[in-house]
Amino acid sequence: MLFKCGHNHAHSNGPANHAPASDAGGHTVKVEKLGVRTVDIHCHLHVPEADALLKDVMDLKNEPLLWFANDETRKFQMAHGQNIMPRATDTSLRLAEMDASGVDVQAISTAPNHYCYWAAPELGRDVAQLVNNKLADVVGEHPDRFVGLCTVPLQNPEMAVTELERAVKDLGMRGVEINADVAGNELSRAGLDPFWAKCEELDVIVFIHPSGFAKGD
């Protein structure tokens, strides 16, 4: 589980806030304090070092948001990515926006373009380890504001199990983020029984975040 329930739900920096339901446009707003802890479970951390590790093998076909798009949509997606990049990489900017938006805790997870299920298993493992170490660093610096959801190389279930165990037991991750398919294969067809068993054994949350879609055959 992400948290244990208790009477003191607010983080140590003060009473918790809550954004009004009318704020659906993605804008930072000044919010009313209601005395309950607000947790945002859908928050990505981008790790530039992972980009560097992947730069020689990246292909547009491996980026569904860009590949399955017309030119106008692709242009928008790329501009949007650049717009949010500072907040996805700079913890101080992230914390400032959390405070302004009334978010007490973020469950941070990898940016979907770093799933890398299309890559060779060893490269996927290296990227996962790099990203998970960075997630752990950010959580360790602000343990009252962040919890971590790790990433694992699902293209190799054995490696995925090993990395999941390391991330949970050694790095303190509370869960794992995965894609809704593994390089086009449905989760039910990807040989993931050992992974699901390890998730159950470790009692961790599985956050399924789609990026692209299965082959459909």
Where are these regions (language model features)?
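Helix-coil boundary/capping segments in enzymes
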Residues: M1-D217
